Amino acid sequence: MEKRKTNPHLSRKRNFQFDGVINMKSLMALKRNKPFTKAVSNMAVMDITDIKPLFTSVYKLLEDNGVFVFATQHPCFVTLTEKYMTPHSYYDIAIEGQPQKQCYYHRSLQDIFNLCFDTGFVIDGFYEECYFNKEIPDIIIVRAIKIER
C-alpha cells in the first residue's frame, strides 16, 4: 500500500484559541495559491458572536461554485424562547458533566439565510436532523454555493 503524501500546509501545527469572536485576518491566513473547492463548519455557528466574518472569509477563500456546508443547532426547536426573532446569547450545557455552562448565540433562520444571500451564497441544500425525537429536529445542515458576483 502506498503511503499518502502529507500536505505541509495542512499538517503544520496550529494553536487555536476561541472566545466566540472570529477574526477575519486569522481566517484569511488560511489562503493558499488556489481557492478552496469546499469548506465545512461543523456545529460552530452557534458558538460565534458575529458570524459575518466567517461567512465573508469562506466566500473569499472558495472558488466560484465552491461549496460551503455548515451545521448548527436548529434555531426553531433547540432554543425555545420568546425572543426567536431577536439575536441573543444564552448559557447551557453541551455535554453532561462539563464544569460550567457555555455561551451560545441564537439567530433566526431568516438571519442565517439572509447572511448567506447577502454574502453571495445560494442555498441549494437544507436538511434537518433529528436525534432525540424523530419529529423535532435538533440540527440544521445548510449547503451553500458561492456564486460569482
Name each model feature, range by range.
Residues 3-4:
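Conserved SAM/SAH-binding beta-strand->alpha-helix loop
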Residues 15-29:
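Conserved SAM-binding strand-loop segment of SAM-dependent methyltransferases
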Residues 28-39:
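A short acidic, Gly/Pro-enriched loop at the edge of an enzyme's catalytic core
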Residues 37-52:
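A short SAM/SAH-binding and catalytic strip from SAM-dependent methyltransferases
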Residues 52-67:
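A short glycine-rich, Lys/Arg-flanked "PGG" loop and its adjoining helix->strand segment in the class I
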Residues 67-96:
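Conserved class I S-adenosyl-L-methionine
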Residues 103-126:
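Short alpha-helix
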Residues 119-121, 129, 134-149:
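Core SAM-dependent methyltransferase catalytic element
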